[in-house]
Amino acid sequence: MDRHNDKFTYSSRRSAEYPYAHACQGDGEVCGVAVEYPTFTTFTVNVIKNHDIEWPRLEADDFIMAIGSTRLLEDACRIAYRELIYWLERNFGFECYDAYTMLSQCGKVRLGNFVDPKYTMGGCDSQKIYRLIFPA
């Protein structure tokens, strides 16, 4: 489907297979390439019913990230941060202004792709902060 001839297979588990992975990639992948290696990788996507999101999200043990992608770089950043604010409101109990203020003070922006027709930005923040504010 792209320059690596990725093969997609679908089953009842809805998995997709990719023959290449990035060993590393600089922010933006500015010349269009990363260090890639052949691999057989299978991942599974879970569908959460009645939980709408506008843009992709990533969640790890130490951070959360919302991803925005569009032609203007600053708009991609706005999309990522807007989605992150919605996420903080819905899942972490933040008020909109408080989430916006905290991201202004603690948030990070990652440039994922700068060479395709659309730029990809990730807005992220440390989950440690939320655990301090909203202990379980």
Regions found by a protein language model. Name each.
Residues 1-49, 82, 89, 96-97, ...:
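Glycine-rich anion/phosphate-binding loop at the beta-strand->alpha-helix junction
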